[in-house]
Amino acid sequence: MREYKLVVLGSRGVGKSALTVQFVQGIFVEKYDPTIEDSYREQVEVDAQQCMLEILDTAGTEQFTAMRDLYMKNGQGFALVYSITAQSTFNDLQDLREQILRVKDTDDVPMILVGNKCDLEDERVVGKEQGQNLARQWNNCAFLESSAKSKINVNEIFYDLVRQINRKTPVPGKARKKSSCQLL
């Protein structure tokens, strides 16, 4: 079974843990409890393939920056999450993306831009078009709006990253047995 290392990044309070826990455990975490770093393993089926996802739920961008390079180096796919209710969380993502590309030393990194808390439409300050435009600027990066509370597009975030990783590095075919031939 193929393993995937996915990293959830964004400012504090955008709902990174809520999205991850909703995906892995199917529950919504109401209480805000700042994360230092949590790791989850979840077996899922994506496009008829069994996959083991290792999901790293990270601290807000302002904290524990020393650890960030390490999980950017080891991660294969990245969910960059902002809250549609806080413009600053959207603005923070540009630097985060640039850091990922610098650490990975490539522009071709499986990534999805996620506008979270779309159930709070009355409190929206970041328009959907802003997210779509930023995703376009980022080499047509995938983009979704989600809500951990209302279970909107939660699974799709992680499944999309798996599909991007599969497109970038297809599963190798079954290795052929090496045979040897001896002439006498």
UniProtKB/Swiss-Prot annotation:
The lineage of its organism: Eukaryota, Metazoa, Chordata, Craniata, Vertebrata. GO terms for cellular component: cytosol; plasma membrane. It comes from Homo sapiens (Human). Residues 182-184 form a propeptide. This is Ras-related protein Rap-1b-like protein. Pfam families: Ras (PF00071). A motif (Effector region) lies at residues 32-40. CDD domains: Rap1. Probable GTP-binding protein with intrinsic GTPase activity. PROSITE patterns: RAS. Belongs to the small GTPase superfamily. Ras family. A lipid is attached at residue 181 (S-geranylgeranyl cysteine). One of its GO terms (biological process) is cellular response to cAMP. Its EC number is 3.6.5.2. GTP binds at residues 10-18, 57-61, 116-119, 147-149. It is an enzyme of class 3 (hydrolase). It comes from the Eukaryota. It catalyses: GTP + H2O = GDP + phosphate + H(+). GO terms for molecular function: GDP binding; GTP binding; GTPase activity. Keywords: ADP-ribosylation, Cell membrane, Cytoplasm, GTP-binding, Hydrolase, Lipoprotein, Membrane, Nucleotide-binding, Prenylation.
